[in-house]
């Protein structure tokens, strides 16, 4: 329940999108995609299928077997459970939200929220591969496959900015020790 999650210092936000409750945490790749469906000549269902196919192709690129189940258009499944959630919203033909791909999150927390609360299994690319998956490799592959699926074969991927610097300071990690927060 939302009250139980908040007691564990997990913020709960209600959103206007389809799909299940999703825990956002380190190790998860979130792709918030904004496109005009009329310009892409796509329906909402076609768009969702494009997102699913892009995730499946990304999984294949990192040697993870993934599949789509027609009965559940809001997920991509690995052999051991859901590896990606799809949650979208469309307003005046423009999409928001998108894909939430579990690369290397803590699965114990993920299994207690959303699908986990419904008894469904949750997995990650690392768990499916049984060895580390590099986030930059997954990010590049996902962007490439999204662009291909959405009809944008030409794209440029920039992963840095001269004024942005990565820091190593840990401000707050509620997953490391929930009692100390």
For the regions a language model picked out, list residue spans one by one:
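Short, conserved beta-strand/beta-arch hydrophobic-aromatic motifs that form part
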Residues: 1-6, 10-11, 83-107
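N-terminal lobe of the biotin/lipoate ligase/transferase fold
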Residues: 1-78, 82-83, 133, 163-181
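Structural signal for conserved beta-strand scaffold positions within catalytic alpha/beta enzyme cores
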Residues: 14, 85, 124-127
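Solvent-exposed alpha-helices and their adjacent loops that cap or buttress functional pockets
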Residues: 22-23, 92-94, 117
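A structural signal for short, well-ordered beta-strand segments
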Residues: 31-33, 74, 86-88, 99-103, ...
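Generic detector of bulky aromatic hydrophobic side chains
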Residues: 37-38, 54, 58, 94-96, ...
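A short secondary-structure junction signal
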Residues: 42-45, 87-88, 110-113
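C-terminal accessory segment of soluble enzyme catalytic cores
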Residues: 96, 107-181
